[in-house]
Design a protein with these regions (language model features):
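Phospho-regulated, low-complexity intrinsically disordered regions of nuclear gene-regulatory
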Residues: 1-21, 29, 34-37, 41-101
């Protein structure tokens, strides 16, 4: 997909509020869970926008990480690119480790 669908723009507008609820340090997976919990309709719409690719969770989450990286140095900083974490399904995985500024 050349550019992210509009649904990612809608979710990005929720970032400031979600970041306010996060601990000082958090993983991308923790951020996704908080975003999904607080903005369920928008999150489901985001998943649906990526459904044709066959991996909607992975593809949406990659798009969301790209948007989070736009905030680096302003609101957050990426401490580790690959940090041990459980994904949103509870499966051992890796994700970014962030710190609020």
């Amino acid at each position: 997909m050349a550019s992210d669908p509009n649904e990612v723009d809608v979710l990005e507008k929720c970032f400031e509020g979600v970041l306010g609820l996060m601990e000082t340090r958090f993983t991308s997976h923790q951020f996704f869970l908080r975003l999904a919990h607080g903005h369920q309709r928008e999150y489901v719409a985001g998943l649906a926008a990526f459904a044709d690719g066959g991996n909607p969770f992975r593809d949406l989450h990659h798009a969301l990480v790209k948007r989070l990286k736009k905030l680096e140095g302003e609101a957050i900083t990426l401490r580790k690119e690959s940090y041990p974490s459980q994904d949103i399904f509870g499966t051992p995985s890796h994700s970014g480790l962030w710190k609020k500024l």
